[in-house]
């Protein structure tokens, strides 16, 4: 009787581990209705970056204003 209970417990734990691994390895696919890629592939979710203009609730440290490179005129504007 005791071995049957332990076998059931091992089977349950193994199935839970497989389920957790499967769910954690999935990639979030964003269903985009307004924008589609040219080749028709779905847009894959990527984590937000800490670049200029990006914000996230867990970022509490403020490093000051964004430093962006100065704007330069395109070559067509410089021609006479």
Swiss-Prot record:
The keyword Repeat appears for this protein: no
Source domain of life: Eukaryota
GO cellular component term, pick one: apoplast
Keywords: Apoplast, Cell membrane, Cleavage on pair of basic residues, Membrane, Secreted, Signal
Protein name: Precursor of secreted transmembrane peptide 7
Tissue localization of expression: Mostly expressed in roots, and, to a lower extent, in leaves, stems, siliques, seeds and flowers.
Recorded family membership: Belongs to the serine rich endogenous peptide (SCOOP) phytocytokine family.
Signal peptide (UniProt feature, chain positions): 1-32
Region (Disordered): 49-80
Its biological purpose: Brassicaceae-specific phytocytokine (plant endogenous peptide released into the apoplast) perceived by MIK2 in a BAK1/SERK3 and SERK4 coreceptors-dependent manner, that modulates various physiological and antimicrobial processes including growth prevention and reactive oxygen species (ROS) response regulation.
Motif range (SCOOP motif): 43-56
Key word Signal present: yes
Motif (SxS motif essential for MIK2 binding): 49-51
Cell compartment(s), UniProt: Cell membrane; Secreted, Extracellular space, Apoplast
GO molecular-function term, one example from the UniProt record: LRR domain binding
Primary location: membrane
Induction remark: Induced by salicylic acid (SA), mainly in roots.
Self-association state and partner proteins as the record states: Interacts with MIK2 (via extracellular leucine-rich repeat domain); this interaction triggers the formation of complex between MIK2 and the BAK1/SERK3 and SERK4 coreceptors, and subsequent BAK1 activation by phosphorylation.
Gene Ontology BP terms: response to salicylic acid
